């Protein structure tokens, strides 16, 4: 199983030579104003990844701010070509002559469905509507820029934590960890209830909204669960990937426990400002995830310790379920609180207003 270099150990695969909406969008009708995309005025870049760039934008008719995620079709075509070539190689039917055939196949699919490259992500986002999950408002096919753009809700509070380039923050207070993880559990419980798994839960994919609610973002690796609940192994961010994903003998694995493991790593990272399983190289880190026992600092709260041990159980059959998380002693404070959206919002806001 081949794994890409995780983003927190390498630079992003961003090609700055490709034009962006901000640098070369339709001309502004006013000086010192950003370019327009439909009714959205682009203000500044918020971030970027391998195939996308995210901008802050404002709807000129309502003055409401949004995040616009732009996908360059040239990058998407390269990614899709690589995926199809890998698939052909696995089937043993690829040869050098197939490259142009694959390109034609991709172009034909694009003509049939302009949103072909991000169809899976769009289909997932369309079924999700929850206060702790990113909301999709509009999709724009920009022929002018050869781009596909998602208009999403803007989260001005920033990330839960940034670990893509290493950890450089202090451990979060116990109550902050509790309130944060409560909302993450509510979000994932909803997502799983819709028959979806996220597959890339990590602090960088969890943002704060204006009201201090958490918002799970980036469903680029998400997928709908088959009826049997099993999925094929796939790449993600290695530090947050469950050990069963590194077992080459497994052709299919249970989907929901993958998200639970990633949630456990996320909780550990914000609680202790370090990874539960780490290594100097990717291979070293994978071996640690697969074989090393979980080590938790001695000062850890006893209920938090038990929760982490259950989330980071290497056997997915024994790993805590999302239903059990809703009743967990650490999150409910031993039954004092029920995990419901309304109760969590009030409690969480008070913590962050101290």
From Swiss-Prot:
It is an enzyme of class 2 (transferase). Residues 40-331 form the Protein kinase domain. Keywords: ATP-binding, Cytoplasm, Kinase, Nucleotide-binding, Nucleus, Serine/threonine-protein kinase, Transferase. SMART domains: S_TKc. It is found in: Cytoplasm; Nucleus. ATP binds at residues 46-54, 69. This is Serine/threonine-protein kinase ppk34. It comes from Schizosaccharomyces pombe (strain 972 / ATCC 24843).
